[in-house]
Amino acid sequence: MSVRLPLLLRQLGRQQLPSGPACRLRELCRSGSRSSSSGGGDPEGLRGRRLQDGQTFSSHGPGNPEAPGMDSIVRDVIHNSKEVLSLLQEKNPAFKPVLVVIQAGDDNLMKDMNQNLAKEAGLDITHICLPPDSGEDEIIDEILKINEDPRVHGLTLQISEDSLSNKVLNALKPEKDVDGVTDINLGKLVRGDAPECFVSPLAKAAVELVEKSGITLDGKKVLVVGAHGPLEAALQWLFQRKGSMTMSCPWATPQLPDKLREADIVVLGSPKPEEIPAVWIPSGTTILNCFHDFLSGKLSGGSPGVPVDKLIAEESVSLLAAALRIQNMVSSGRRWLREQQHRRWRLHCLKLQPLSPVPSDIEISRGQTPKAVDVLAKEIGLLADEIEIYGKSKAKVQLSLLERLKDQTDGKYVLVAGITPTPLGEGKSTVTIGLVQALTAHLKVNSFACLRQPSQGPTFGVKGGAAGGGYAQVIPMEEFNLHLTGDIHAITAANNLLAAAIDTRILHESTQTDKALYNRLVPLVNGVREFSEIQLSRLKKLGIHKTDPSTLTEEEVRKFARLNIDPATITWQRVLDTNDRFLRKITIGQGSTEKGYSRQAQFDIAVASEIMAVLALTDSLTDMKERLGRMVVASDKDGQPVTAEDLGVTGALTVLMKDAIKPNLMQTLEGTPVFVHAGPFANIAHGNSSVLADKIALKLVGEEGFVVTEAGFGADIGMEKFFNIKCRASGLVPNVVVLVATVRALKMHGGGPSVTAGVPLKKEYTEENIQLVADGCCNLQKQIQIAQLFGVPVVVALNVFKTDTRAEIDLVCELAKRAGAFDAVPCYHWSAGGKGSVDLARAVREAANKRSRFQFLYDVQLPIVEKIRVIAQTVYGAKDIELSPEAQSKIDRYTQQGFGNLPICMAKTHLSLSHEPDKKGVPRDFTLPISDVRASIGAGFIYPLVGTMSTMPGLPTRPCFYDIDLDTETEQVKGLF
């Protein structure tokens, strides 16, 4: 043990053999005390005065057997605490418990005592010193801040009795209340749940010191005088547990003389008033002094006139209490670590009462009252300061959670993909939600769904919402499908700010001299020119190592001020979250103020913005800022890339996106958690929800839990991009692929009539047709083979419709297993909720235990053309690829610019394995045409355009908005589906 504890004991007046060279100690003395003449060394102070006055300082009376010294008692407590902490830190090296002491007044003795004991045990300690006259609200404000700090594991209050109101005490979080003063801790103590609560260190010290002095408590009469509140309750309970008959009373009680005469042990909870004669306490009574004046910073040293032949002084109680507080701190840390480990959530799942026929999605959603989102957050282990609540049913989650749970083992990772879909969709979102409802609400396994945020374009267009459907959906579905927390609006604002910066820069460069342009870019402010931080970064990129704007040469000024953007190479478009076909090609700059600068441009749908892809692939705020800065918007006239960083807009984009980076927390119909975050399209982008949502969810579910995420469209598009793009960015590898199929889609691939949104299905789809199903299973078999290319086990989920027959269902499951699926399971979640997907959940759990042999499809170091060819031939089944001259030119440019080692994101129709939407089943012997190649350098991929791909959808003849309305009386949304 280090020298700190012996020194502290000597400061408090204990006899202690010298250890090493003598030290000059700060003496905590009473005025008028004289120096001890002993060479070894009891410093003049409290003990010296008592010995001179004939008082006994030890915890035993004259003639009693020698009790253990205080130093050995405290030493044992601290040593045991240190050993336990060391064992905890062996398994958790980053774990360092922190005790915070909120102190009102200048109590240096208590401060020193806490600091020395904490350091001896290996704890960190922080003192917050408030003015002595601090009010209740000020104290509570400090408590609430500490409550929500995940770095703090214990909180103690050392303030005057007058300030310790019930409101103040119960402001403490019970799990951080190492003094055991909250009603919850006291209630558990009284109920007999001492192992589950914190016991008052002061009360526990009092009882232990009596026992250490050789007194048997069984049958003794104990009187607690002048104590109240938590201390009184704890003392009474602890003495009663030892078999003592315990009474409690204030000093002013009329029966006090009789009670004192009857007591074997008297515990003083406050100073004895002068008017109460000392003779009321009979000789031979054991007295414990538990009072300490926090404002004066002085130990009470006993109450005036109290007989001291069996006095256990306050400094003895205080020192042991401080050591026991450290013991409680270690227990708090141990409990906290246990909470961080995998545990089954204490989740209150919402009950479903499925109806038949199944009502509309919005009726089902509205018929279920969601839990308050803060309740859900607490159930899954989020701290109060880790969420930002939006309304009652959605919240954003802070990225700091990843740091707190960095040592937590990830859960199992499940990807939901699908066969080549009909235009109606085959229910991947519904399967995803049904699966997590089954896992958590029915199998009691922690699980999280991670979904993309839907664009408002399809919501008001032809597809409708994307919250799932039937009894497997996210609620409230109208909030899910509309603005949510504004992430897409933030992307729109950031994207269009960058677009404005591009054209504005071209305009200003074309109308100003180098000097005028430079003077405006680096203006005089109070007579001084200074480069901004982002301008210094540009200088560094240009190889100009200067920081004084006045020292640049004319050539350096020109290089710095002029980007020389080639308008013909601009790839950055403006965006809007609305389907508007008339913005597919526009002319900008036709106003007279633009001085004749105009060019042809276009609008894309907002979710096609590269900023959406950046949001989906980033893993931190720092990474997002770097990715935003790397986004290439054009080339200059020398063929070099021009980035957002060159335009000086990176910081502004990051500011606009700082809240959008936080995943959005919602819930399913059965009250299980869902992250809704990022929504890139799968045909024109990579089509997956965010890396951050997946990473946070994997930590929250724990080692035995499951995170289920979805890849857009068919496995040939969304799943391939998930593996080759998202998994490269995240470093995560899924344990299982769930491949969603429907009898309807299989009939289409088997040669059935075309399926068109808004047009009733032909009879082939509503009546049994075994042959069509059998012929169409070729597409299912191909998609299973694609998943197997990556070495991940496949479970087929057959999303059953009411028109499907048992023979059709059995046939699909049989053929899927023959094709190599680990299992194939019919699912009824749409009509029955999680209960209808329990078999799927069991199959997924079993498949997740199978060893995955994951591998990427290609090496990113291959040339761009070869990577495109690998995907076309291996995944789509193409004979070869054909590059247009423009595509070849772009590939050459990106390779020359150093972007040739990025993964590939194919922009292709989702309605066929080929480039032709009407080619169903498994097309063969086709050549895949690459019409253009673009680059999302910030997101980190090259995306070839296959055939003609529109990045701005249009509205149909009868859009969904015909059915959408608002009840102005109730403010309820109608018509969403």
Curated annotation (Swiss-Prot):
Gene Ontology biological process terms in this record: 10-formyltetrahydrofolate biosynthetic process; embryonic neurocranium morphogenesis; embryonic viscerocranium morphogenesis; formate biosynthetic process; neural tube closure; tetrahydrofolate interconversion
Positions of the UniProt region annotated as Methylenetetrahydrofolate dehydrogenase and cyclohydrolase: 32-347
Source species taxonomy: Eukaryota, Metazoa, Chordata, Craniata, Vertebrata
Name of this chain's protein: Monofunctional C1-tetrahydrofolate synthase, mitochondrial
Catalysed reactions listed for this entry: (6S)-5,6,7,8-tetrahydrofolate + formate + ATP = (6R)-10-formyltetrahydrofolate + ADP + phosphate
Functional description taken from the UniProt entry: May provide the missing metabolic reaction required to link the mitochondria and the cytoplasm in the mammalian model of one-carbon folate metabolism complementing thus the enzymatic activities of MTHFD2.
PROSITE patterns according to UniProt: FTHFS_1, FTHFS_2
InterPro entries associated with the record: Aminoacid_DH-like_N_sf, Formate_THF_ligase, Formate_THF_ligase_CS, NAD(P)-bd_dom_sf, P-loop_NTPase, THF_DH/CycHdrlase, THF_DH/CycHdrlase_cat_dom, THF_DH/CycHdrlase_NAD-bd_dom
Subunit structure: Homodimer.
Residues the record lists as Phosphoserine modifications: 356
Species this protein is from: Mus musculus
Region of interest: Disordered: 29-71
